[in-house]
Amino acid sequence: MKAQFWSFDAVFAMTIFGSSLLIITFIWMGVTNQFSLAYGFGLQTMQAQVQSLQNRILTSGSPQNWNAAINATNSSTWRNVSVGLGIGVGSQLSLNKIMTLMAMSSYSTASYQATKPLLGVGYDYYILINSSNATMAMGLYPYTRNPYAVQVARQSAVLNGVPVRVQVIVWTNKSFGVS
């Protein structure tokens, strides 16, 4: 019986090896599926937030004259405000509201972070308004901060009777999935 390959030891070793391989395969598939689901939901959330922000920009906000009701450099006055850049008529934007949001988002890192809930976003944001003679930007520019994921939405609007192009970017430099 010394020359037989199918001895008890060989069968036992193959069973252990096969079981180990099977367990590793199940673990590997579970981790990759978990990562895939987390990444997918993260992108879906970002897409929803960029669409929501794009729509919110055209609203007048709450209250309609929110920019007159706050101090742009004091985030404690922003409590009961929802930010919108529109005047409440179609796709017309308010220069005063744009300038107020620019001041709010660029005053300090803490004030920028405080503007995110006012805009309804949990990720970082960047809003760019371009016309033939002016460019206005609010938020953090993503491409100098090594973004992990970026979602962009574009729309046309009117500012002081001049057509403008609004680009809304929601981005993050953190992973969505398992770290």
Where are the language model's segments positioned?
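Glycine-centered recognition micro-motifs in short, flexible terminal segments and loops
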Residues: M1-G18
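Long, compositionally biased, intrinsically disordered regions
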Residues: T15, L22-S179
